[in-house]
Amino acid sequence: MKYGIIGAGSTGKAAAAWLHQAGCPALVWDRSPRKRADLAQSGLLATGKVEGQLPVETADTLEELAARCDILLIQTLAEGHRPVAEGLAGHLRPGQILLVTNCCWGAAELAQVLGQEAAEKGCRIAETSGQLILANSPGPGQVYLKTVKKQLLLACTDPAATGAVLEALRPEWPQYAAASSILETSLSGTNPVTHGPIALFNLARMDNGEDYRLFADGLSPLTARCVEQLDIERVAVARACGVPVRTALELLNDAWPTPQPTLYDAFHSNPSYMVTKGPATTHHRFITEDLPYGLAPLVLLGRLHGVPTPALDALLDMFRLAMGTDYIALAPALDWKGLSAFLPYQGLPLEGKLAALAD
């Protein structure tokens, strides 16, 4: 199986390093010509869980990557999911796997754009419940793989295909486990409920460009309590949608070797989190991604299912006041009522579900 990586940020470079170590070098594409040129000319210096100076092969176009690869890892920010899907339209090959690695409703967006073509060509669209590798980029041709989680959820837009996708990925990614649906993977993503309060209560630090540690300095016991309140609402919304999700604390304890009694303890006892730097700008994914793609959908689904979300509403209102942006209006352009089509055992064959969603 040939892997293609879409996006050469820290997570894309981490995936490239991981696959190289596994004896499965990937083809990499990024929308930035400079990033592509740097990687092609100088390769990638990996440190941490993978060590070494690694060669990187790049594709000049998204179409070239699609033509040469069997498994496409979409490692972009959430705002890049739809443009990537539009760029891939008409270029899928039979039997390909398209895997979105940061949830945020990415698989649903891909299905909205590519679903009919994917069904006709036997392609599988999937997403994970978060990033498997915690990584950062010290420099343009560098990546530091801090740690690798022991387990993450994965689901396909067609739940019946999840097992086959897991088997295809298992040689390189044995950490993935089956989720019931892409609603479970997107609603299991706990980054938004974690990052939102941290960003709000450290907004002055971000605005001033200060140097601080995200969890060691930015997550106090009171901030952790706010995270827990948002997480209670996330779980309530998910259960109203018929989706079995676990709490943020349960998921953290699943991902790391030593269980902890509270969210505060889970973050502060993990050395990987203690060295993570906090954002030094308000133009950061904690705001531009986690609010519209993570928290706003919870509010919209809460309204749809009659689940009150006072903590989420308050947090988004404060960000609207500070940033002058309505993040609810920036939520993914999905038919939220139609998401039940992605749940198992809905009666319609996959082609019928996708046609209904496209109408």
What do these predicted regions represent?
Residues 49-68:
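Short acidic low-complexity segments
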Residues 224-359:
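NAD(P)-dependent Rossmann-like dehydrogenase/reductase catalytic/cofactor-binding core
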Residues 73-74, 78-141:
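Rossmann-like NAD(P)(H) cofactor-binding subdomain of soluble oxidoreductases
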Residues 1-49:
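NAD(P)+-binding Rossmann beta1-loop-alpha1 motif at the extreme N-terminus of oxidoreductases
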Residues 139-251:
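Internal alpha-helical scaffold of NAD(P)-dependent oxidoreductase catalytic cores
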